[in-house]
Swiss-Prot record:
HAMAP family noted in UniProt: IPP_trans
Chain positions of site Interaction with substrate tRNA: 100, 121
InterPro entries registered for this protein in UniProt: Dimethylallyltransferase, IPT, P-loop_NTPase
Role summary: Catalyzes the transfer of a dimethylallyl group onto the adenine at position 37 in tRNAs that read codons beginning with uridine, leading to the formation of N6-(dimethylallyl)adenosine (i(6)A).
Keyword Zinc tagged: no
Enzyme Commission no: 2.5.1.75
Binding-site list for ATP: 9-16
Any GO BP annotation: tRNA modification
Upper taxonomic lineage: Bacteria, Bacillati, Actinomycetota, Actinomycetes, Mycobacteriales
Pfam families assigned to the protein according to its UniProt record, in alphabetical order: IPPT
Catalytic reactions of this protein: adenosine(37) in tRNA + dimethylallyl diphosphate = N(6)-dimethylallyladenosine(37) in tRNA + diphosphate
UniProt-recorded name of the protein: tRNA dimethylallyltransferase
Chain residues that bind substrate: 11-16
Amino acid sequence: MTRPIAVIGPTATGKSALALELAERLGGEIVNADAMQLYRGMDIGTAKVPECERRGLVHHMLDVLDVTETATVATYQERAVATIDDIRARGHVPVIVGGSMMYIQALLDDWAFPATDPQVRARWEERLAQIGVTALHAELAARDPAAAAIILPTDGRRTVRALEVIELTGQPFAASAPTIGPPRWDTLIVGLDWETEKLDDRIARRTDLMFEQGFVGEVEYLLSTGLRDGVTASRAIGYAQVIAALDAGGGAGALAQARDLTFVGTRRYVRRQRSWFGRDHRVVWLAGESVETGGPEGLAGEIVSRWRLSSNT
């Protein structure tokens, strides 16, 4: 069966454009690996490729959740693995694209996750809504100091997950960490990155464009559909900052600060992505700067040649 290709790397490096070019050349189908692009309606703030720009190519794992639902790596893994197996069985090439670190790792490698229980999780999510993330994190610290030490006091999603696992297993959270198995499909993993100064400029321009294209209106609409109740979606970079600005009155100053904080939060996230992906020796890193001269077409040609050689096709 066909060998998948994964296009990974930090935010704003041009992964989506490269994935489109690869899928078109190989007759492939695109599989999203960006956690926030799983959500319907979260389009501008996640830089989701508009349907009119998808070149008629099949896209999977986009717009599969309401903003009130919680995205989990385990659920994503189950659905995405089945999707890729189906694509391969039909003789097509899966082109995986995204920058959500654990989602990509759990997809490309055989991770086994501890049990989950929607009712238990819902109870802890309700507790989070009642007392706030700081107080809930303090409860985690009382139950499992080691877990609290590695989870940020502002990370409500991971705090809830830790408390859920502790309740279900009766063990410390660390004892229930995912078991990492072997690679699934011998995927060709391509990483795209830029020099830091240039990537910062791309992030700034993307952030400005988001706000110019109606990002605030998107958040306002999603709030009317329950975004505030979404444990995962409401904490996405950009969305959380705009929600706070709207709560502060939505004035020009508050929204300008939301824009600045979105930029800062994205840069911070890029550092985490680089650290995570940089540890994977399988990644073939390509310089995003080459897009400036040859466009995604030039990079795609190089990747396709490498893929054909390694796949003996």
